[in-house]
């Protein structure tokens, strides 16, 4: 958000104490700035190792169908390898969770609360639904992926990606003295690469089907999960370029969140690495005082030069 107690003007990049502050500098305008700097440098030599296609697309943060998805479906996403710069520089990401948004609407019958026995309370009817979801949540979140988690999450004790089931919104009733005739629960399901989106939806549907509550269940599938072979030559090439450009050999990990890049990777089959300019526990993306280390920004430009130069 641009509102709030920013220490700097959010719509202008400002350098302070070795960091650059501004809205979106980490996620992910900083990566774009570094790319432009790298391309300027490469233009001086006139040689690159690859024929480049650069896609700067919109709407990744909202909805489940971004500009990258649109271009993919048009057949415009082509190539032998892809580098997605929407990430952190802690690790090279080769996997991510998928996301499904769900909505369960429990129906009842309204009445005056003084004679509530004449109605059917949809909020109270939703309690068994929530209990069934919480039971399924425990089962779902006991699973683990073979894809390692990020360095930041590993330091917190989470060694690999895990699926998630969340109830994040509830809406029911219009007034205290009216029996509610509707209660809507909303949430999401994070799908690890070993799961399928279809199976995850079927599992949730099966958990709620035995309940007596009159209910409508809807799914809104978003970005799919992604997994790239860690032994692919492109993965090694990216890691080695990071070592030359930024001075460290990065570990491989997965993103606990979801990426529109996964849609393009799934549809095209093009091997993909995700590597950006921010740091997961420092950059405060989507928050006040979003920032990136100046040294990381310059190092990322050097990484791109190392990756692309002939």
What are these regions (language model features)?
Residues 39-60:
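Short helix-loop-beta-strand segments that form the rim/entrance of peptidase-like active sites
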Residues 19, 55-63, 68, 85-89, ...:
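Acidic, glycine-rich active-site loops and adjacent beta-strand->loop/helix elements
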Residues 1-21, 44-49, 284:
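Acidic/His- and Gly-rich active-site-bordering loop/insert found
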Residues 69, 73-213, 223:
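Midchain, well-structured core segments that form catalytic/ion-binding scaffolds
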Residues 227-242:
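Short, low-order "capping/linker" segments at domain edges
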Residues 241, 246-308:
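Zn-dependent metallopeptidase/amidohydrolase metal-coordination segment
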Residues 53, 60, 103, 120-136, ...:
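Structural helix-boundary/capping segments
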Residues 24-39:
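Active-site alpha-helical elements of protease catalytic centers
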């Amino acid at each position: 958000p641009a509102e709030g107690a920013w220490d700097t003007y959010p719509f202008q990049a400002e350098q302070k104490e070795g960091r650059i502050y501004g809205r979106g500098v980490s996620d992910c305008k900083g990566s774009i700035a570094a790319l432009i700097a790298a391309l300027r440098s490469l233009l001086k030599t006139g040689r690159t190792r690859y024929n480049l296609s650069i896609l700067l697309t919109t709407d990744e943060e909202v909805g489940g169908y971004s500009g990258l998805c649109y271009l993919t479906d048009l057949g415009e996403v082509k190539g032998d390898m892809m580098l997605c710069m929407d990430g952190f520089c802690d690790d090279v990401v080769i996997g991510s969770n998928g996301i499904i948004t769900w909505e369960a609407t429990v129906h009842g019958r309204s009445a005056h609360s003084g004679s509530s026995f004449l109605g059917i309370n949809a909020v109270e009817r939703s309690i068994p639904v929530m209990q069934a979801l919480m039971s399924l949540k425990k089962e779902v979140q006991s699973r683990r992926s073979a894809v390692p988690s990020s360095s930041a999450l590993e330091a917190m004790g989470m060694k690999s990606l895990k699926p998630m089931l969340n109830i994040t919104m509830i809406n029911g009733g219009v007034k205290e003295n009216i029996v509610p005739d509707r209660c809507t629960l909303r949430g999401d399901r994070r799908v690890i690469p070993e799961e399928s989106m279809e199976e995850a939806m079927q599992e949730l549907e099966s958990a709620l089907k035995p309940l007596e509550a009159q209910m409508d269940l809807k799914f809104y599938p978003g970005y799919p999960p992604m997994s790239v072979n860690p032994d692919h030559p492109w993965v090694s090439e990216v890691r080695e370029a990071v070592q030359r450009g930024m001075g460290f050999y990065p570990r491989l990990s997965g993103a606990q969140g979801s990426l529109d890049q996964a849609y393009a990777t799934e549809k095209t089959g093009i091997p993909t690495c995700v590597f950006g300019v921010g740091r997961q526990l420092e950059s405060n993306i989507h928050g006040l005082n979003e920032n990136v280390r100046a040294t990381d920004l310059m190092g990322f430009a050097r990484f791109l030069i190392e990756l692309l130069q002939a």
